[in-house]
């Protein structure tokens, strides 16, 4: 008759086997931590669930983009290779980064309703939007200052968007000029607008985008009152590099838009400063100024969505 199997002992042996692997060593699960996890269950029984949770928390840097399993694998590398201020600029959210966590938690609540026994040999994820056919509904959002992360900046993003036929939005504070990005994309892109405090300067940016054939203007409306980016500010403080070559410090902001392509050669301010006084009336002004389609970026309430229709 076979001896009875001791599940506690078998589980302990299994965890020790895992802990001895190179993967666990690179993740930092060695020595005393492993011993603690092995003896952490009730009555000294190893807690497998706790062990695997600890494994999942470890940040293991990938050696190449081919090793990435999801986009968050690149964040681990970014922490290691980017200057502190550059990493903080990309990783920061508002205040204590609570909105970043809230957004992630919100998306985690979404699920897919999978239908079974469907022929998946030919899947069509394409959409029609503003009269144009796109391969997927994926939109590359307007992250700014891409030269802080790659020398090709938004030009590289445009090439990727062209290869996959994705919509690309270009930020007002992009490192690359809209004319160059449009050429790299091979067709007009969408333009994300930060309205200037003066209408004549805003109009100049709108007309410049229009001249490249841009079909859609995306006005960001959730940044009119400024923002408090604590993570970015903290990491800027510990970055001791001389950043004056790329950034122009001002009295109110560390970085001025004037050093960005879309902020250069703007006309001198004329008339009243709009500053924080922009309201829904400004939408009509934009629509009257350009034939481009207008999207409002930053709407979060049902009431504002109804006003935007």
Segments and roles (model prediction):
Residues 2-22:
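N-terminal secretory signal peptides and thylakoid transit peptides that target proteins
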Residues 138-141, 168-170, 189-191, 217, ...:
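Hydrophobic faces of well-ordered beta-strands that scaffold small-molecule active sites
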């Amino acid at each position: 008759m076979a001896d009875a199997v001791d599940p506690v002992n078998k589980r302990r042996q299994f965890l020790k086997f895992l802990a001895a692997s190179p993967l666990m060593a690179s993740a930092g699960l060695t020595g005393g931590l492993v011993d603690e996890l092995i003896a952490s269950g009730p009555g000294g029984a190893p807690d497998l669930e706790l062990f695997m949770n600890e494994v999942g928390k470890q940040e293991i840097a990938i050696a190449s983009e081919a090793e990435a399993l999801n986009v968050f694998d690149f964040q681990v590398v970014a922490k290691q290779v980017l200057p502190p201020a550059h990493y903080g600029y990309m990783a920061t959210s508002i205040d204590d980064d609570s909105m970043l966590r809230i957004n992630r938690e919100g998306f985690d609540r979404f699920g897919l309703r999978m239908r079974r026994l469907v022929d998946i040999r030919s899947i069509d994820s394409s959409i029609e939007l503003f009269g144009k056919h796109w391969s997927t509904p994926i939109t590359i959002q307007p992250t700014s200052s891409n030269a802080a992360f790659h020398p090709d900046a938004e030009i590289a993003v445009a090439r990727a968007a062209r290869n996959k036929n994705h919509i690309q939005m270009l930020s007002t504070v992009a490192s690359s000029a809209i004319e160059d990005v449009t050429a790299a994309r091979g067709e007009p892109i969408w333009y994300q607008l930060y309205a200037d405090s003066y209408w004549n300067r805003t109009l100049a940016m709108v007309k410049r985008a229009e001249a490249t054939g841009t079909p859609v203007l995306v006005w960001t409306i959730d940044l009119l009152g400024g923002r408090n980016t604590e993570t970015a500010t903290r990491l800027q403080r510990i970055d001791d590099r001389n950043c004056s070559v790329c950034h122009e410090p001002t009295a109110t902001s560390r970085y001025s838009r004037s050093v960005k392509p879309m902020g250069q050669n703007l006309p001198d301010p004329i008339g009243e400063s709009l500053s924080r006084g922009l309201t829904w009336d400004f939408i009509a002004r934009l629509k009257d100024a350009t034939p481009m389609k207008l999207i409002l970026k930053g709407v979060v309430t049902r009431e504002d969505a109804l006003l935007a229709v």
